[in-house]
């Protein structure tokens, strides 16, 4: 069984923000036998799903399908969260707190932090990094999080005052699930992106010694890392392997020790091969985002028709060999926010009636699904196309592009439908970003006053009852306005062999290389 780490008791802690110093439990590799204390030395080969275009943290993604292994190795973290309890554990930061309900925060840093070029990692460095991510011209995937900040003010070397555009007492989670958590040397960034790619500078547990593009990255231990005796490893080799089957085969054959994983199919094969698997607990999931800014999905009937036309269990079989987790509700039953409110209804007869009604009005549902070339993404788009081909008055084309071409299309909102995700732990940081009309991360473009009001209420609610009532309305409105077809829970996971230990993930499947160590 794929190892899921969320329990009902732990999930109850997510109702309100808890700030503390206790971390998530570390877990081992393929074996659950005790392995003793961490051992320094040795090297590990790890796999990430997607190679970065640049090493500038503004261009990276801090999640399991992005470059979390790379970012955490090179830059370290300001803070992390425990996916089980959602407690915040401070790292290079020592405090991030609000005294006025999330209107302002004070970020405190450890004194004496330095980048590997000898320059200080101070409040000014955080200020400059966050300004860059908030610049729309940077095209950062973390713009939705950074854009919530109105201003930052350097108080002293270790103190940064953060003023929010709107109150958000849950903003710590927008740091842990984004590249706001990764701070690069401003002096190195000022030399330009090409120079930074050749010689990136962070304050993380490892430094980059070589980048063979389309192949691998080599890292060595940073002897001046702030959290001695970590890191335990002397070196890391980071490979880029986009295919899930190949990732499993490499671990099973001894070609790698750990891999970030996105695929339910690959996770099932990994367990069959005797490998270890760890899955970060999430609700929500991946969805077909219908662009409500333009036809045909500016008409809610078109959105409902497509939603009701699709058989999600068949998509699971075709795309994931039946191993995926099709979400029936926004929150899993273990969540304190769970309500038995269905995300979708398969109703082919009503779908065809709506397709016919729209066609009679001169508005047939013709659209293009923008997909990446990742195998499962492309397969999901193609099986969706095949299902809709069984209906009259609807036509779906598939356009598959590589990730470098996908990003500018996403930023420009130049698509009819594409795959997006809202993977829910602390609900505010995900749901507000994904579906609030003011959010720069609202890929569907949905604008619904009742949904907005509920998302705002969930963000600022001060009691479990207030937040629960708000997110019940959110669940109802997402069902009613239908901006998305939720087709699978995400699989933010790692696969491991039995000789690597100290595996810990924060937020959306972001592994922490500083804590890993090897035996054998």
Predicted feature residues:
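Ligand-site clamp/hinge motif
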Residues: 223-269, 393
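N-terminal lobe/hinge region of extracytoplasmic solute-binding protein
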Residues: 47-98, 131, 201, 510
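Long beta-strand-rich cores associated with HINT superfamily self-processing modules
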Residues: 494-520
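Ligand/substrate-recognition segments at binding pockets and active sites
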Residues: 356-424, 464
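Surface-exposed binding/hinge segments that line
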Residues: 106-108, 143-187, 210
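Extracytoplasmic/peripheral linker and loop segments enriched in polar/acidic and small residues
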Residues: 395-400, 404-406, 433-498, 520
């Amino acid at each position: 069984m794929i190892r899921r780490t969320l329990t009902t008791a732990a999930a109850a802690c997510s109702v309100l923000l808890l700030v503390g110093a206790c971390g998530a439990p570390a877990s081992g590799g393929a074996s659950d036998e005790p392995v003793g204390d961490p051992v320094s030395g040795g090297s590990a080969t790890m796999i990430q799903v997607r190679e970065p275009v640049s090493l500038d943290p503004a261009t990276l993604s801090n999640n399991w399908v992005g470059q979390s292994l790379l970012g955490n190795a090179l830059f370290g973290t300001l803070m992390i969260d425990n996916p089980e309890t959602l407690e915040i554990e401070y790292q290079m930061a020592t405090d991030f707190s609000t005294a006025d309900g999330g209107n302002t925060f004070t970020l405190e840093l450890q004194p004496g932090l330095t980048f590997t070029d000898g320059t200080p990692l101070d409040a000014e460095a955080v200020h400059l990094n966050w300004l860059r991510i908030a610049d729309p011209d940077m095209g950062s995937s973390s713009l939705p999080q950074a854009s919530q900040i109105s201003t930052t003010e350097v108080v002293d070397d270790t103190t940064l005052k953060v003023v929010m555009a709107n109150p958000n007492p849950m903003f710590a989670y927008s740091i842990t699930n984004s590249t706001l958590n990764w701070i690069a040397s401003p002096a190195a960034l000022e030399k330009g992106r090409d120079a930074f790619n050749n010689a990136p500078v962070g304050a993380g547990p490892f430094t980059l010694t070589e980048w063979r593009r389309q192949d691998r990255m080599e890292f060595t231990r940073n002897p001046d890392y702030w959290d001695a005796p970590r890191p335990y490893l002397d070196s890391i080799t980071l490979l880029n392997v986009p295919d899930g089957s190949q990732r499993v085969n490499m671990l099973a054959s001894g070609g790698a020790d750990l891999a970030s994983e996105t695929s339910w199919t690959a996770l099932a094969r990994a367990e069959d091969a005797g490998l270890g698997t760890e899955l970060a607990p999430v609700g929500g999931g991946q969805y077909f985002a219908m662009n409500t800014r333009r036809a045909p999905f500016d008409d809610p009937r078109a959105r409902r028709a497509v939603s009701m036309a699709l058989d999600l269990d068949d998509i699971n079989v075709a795309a994931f060999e039946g191993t995926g987790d099709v979400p029936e509700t926004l929150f899993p039953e273990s969540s304190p926010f769970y309500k038995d409110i269905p995300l979708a209804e398969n109703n082919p007869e009503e779908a065809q009636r709506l397709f016919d009604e729209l066609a009679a009005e001169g508005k047939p549902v013709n659209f293009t699904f923008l997909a990446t070339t990742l195998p499962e993404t492309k397969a999901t788009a193609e099986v969706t196309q095949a299902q809709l081909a069984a209906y009259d008055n609807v036509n779906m084309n598939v356009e598959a592009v590589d990730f470098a071409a996908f990003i500018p299309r996403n930023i420009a909102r130049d698509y009819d439908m594409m795959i997006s995700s809202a993977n829910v732990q602390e609900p505010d940081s995900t749901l507000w970003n994904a579906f609030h009309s003011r959010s720069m991360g609202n890929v569907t473009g949905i604008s619904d006053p009742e949904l907005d009001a509920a998302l705002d209420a969930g963000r600022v609610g001060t009691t479990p009852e207030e937040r629960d009532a708000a997110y019940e309305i959110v669940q109802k409105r997402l069902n009613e306005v239908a901006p998305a077809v939720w087709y699978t829970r995400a699989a933010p996971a790692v696969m491991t062999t039995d000789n690597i230990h100290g595996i810990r993930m924060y937020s959306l499947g972001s592994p922490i290389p500083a804590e890993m160590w090897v035996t054998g």
